[in-house]
Amino acid sequence: MKKLILSSLCMLMGLTSMSAQTALQNEILEVAHRTNNYFMTKYSDPTLDTFVKKVRTSNLWTRAVYYEGLMALYEIDPQQRYLDYTDKWADYHKWTARGSVNDTDADNQCCQQTYMDRYVQTGGKKDLSKVKENLDHQMSTKRVNYWTWIDAIQMAMPAYAKYAKITGERKYLDYAMNSYKWSRDTLANGLFNKKEGLWWRDKDYVPPYKEKDGSNCYWSRGNGWVYAALVRVMETLPKTDKYYQYLKKDFISMSQAILKCQREDGYWNVSLVCPANYGGPEMTGTGLFLYGMAWGVQHGILPRATYQKAMDKAWKA
C-alpha cells in the first residue's frame, strides 16, 4: 500500500534541519516519484475497472485515496501529467460519487475529495454539481448514523469539510461534525475510547470483545484513517474555529496513544496493542501515522522533541 504514503512523504519535506534538508528532500522525492511512476505505469489508463477478487469501477475508495496522495505530490512537484491523469479519471466518472449521486456509502463518496481539489486548483473550472447533489441528498435524510465503521470518517468527512470551505456554507461542516460525533460518542456507546485515545473499528469490536491476550482491539489501519481525517478536516478550518479546537483535542489524544504503540522497528502492529493478532508490521497504518505526526509537528500542535524520533523510525521502516 505504498501509494498511501505519498502524502506522508510530502509532509516530511519540511521537518529536517537545514544541513540535512536537501538530502532528505531529494530522497523523499525519489521515493515518491518511484512509487507514483510504478502506479501510473501499471495503471496507465485510469478509467479501467480494477480487479481485486472482483471487478470494481476505478473511482472506488482505494483509488480515491491514491489521488489524495497524488494531489499532495503535485503541491511539491507540479507536473502536468499528474493533473492530466487525474482529470481523465474524473471526467470518465463524470465528477460523480461512485454508484450514483444518491449513494450514501462513505467508500463511494471518497473520490469527491479529489474532485474538489481539482476545482480549487483550476479556480472553479470543474463541475461540482454532482458533488453538491450527493452531499445534499445524504443531508436531506436527516440521519447522521451512516459512518458505522471508522474508516468511513476518512472516506467522507473531509468531503463535507472541503465543500463547506468552497461554498462558505456552514451546514456541510455541521453535518460532518454531527456524523463524526455520532460515531465517536453514540454508536455502541462510542467507538472512541477516550481513556486510551484509540478507536474500535466498529460495534463488533467494542468490549466485551477482546484480543486473545485480553487487550482491547484497535486496528492500525482504521485508526490511521481517523488520524488522517482529522488532519484533512483541520486543514480546511481556521485555528479559531470551534470545530478545529474540538478535533485538535482528539488529534493530540490519538497522537499520544499512537506514539506509545510504535514498534521498535518503526512500524505499528496490525492490532495496535496486541502483537500476536496478525503479528508483524502493518504498512497502511504506519504510513498514515507518519503523515499525521508530520503534519502535527509542522503545524506546531505536536512537540518535535517528542515525535521526531518516532517519525525518523517510521520513515526508515
Named regions from a protein language model:
Residues M1-A23:
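Bacterial Sec-dependent N-terminal signal peptides
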Residues Q21-K88, Q121-E133, R170-K171, N193-K194:
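Low-complexity, Ser/Thr/Pro/Gly-enriched N-terminal "stalk/linker" regions
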Residues A23, A64-Q79, C110-G124, A156-E169, ...:
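Well-ordered alpha-helical scaffold segments within catalytic/enzyme domains
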Residues T35-S58, Y82-D105, L135-D151, D185-G214, ...:
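Glycine- and aromatic-rich loop/turn segments at beta-sheet edges
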Residues F39, Y43, L70, Y74-D77, ...:
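Sec/Tat-exported extracytoplasmic proteins
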Residues S58-V65, G69, T104-C110, A152-A156, ...:
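Short, conserved alpha-helical segments within structured domains
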Residues K94-T96, D105-K162:
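Extracytoplasmic mature domains of secreted/periplasmic and thylakoid-lumen proteins
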Residues I150-D151, A161-L272, G279-L290, L302-A317:
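Extended ligand-binding clefts on enzyme/binding-domain cores
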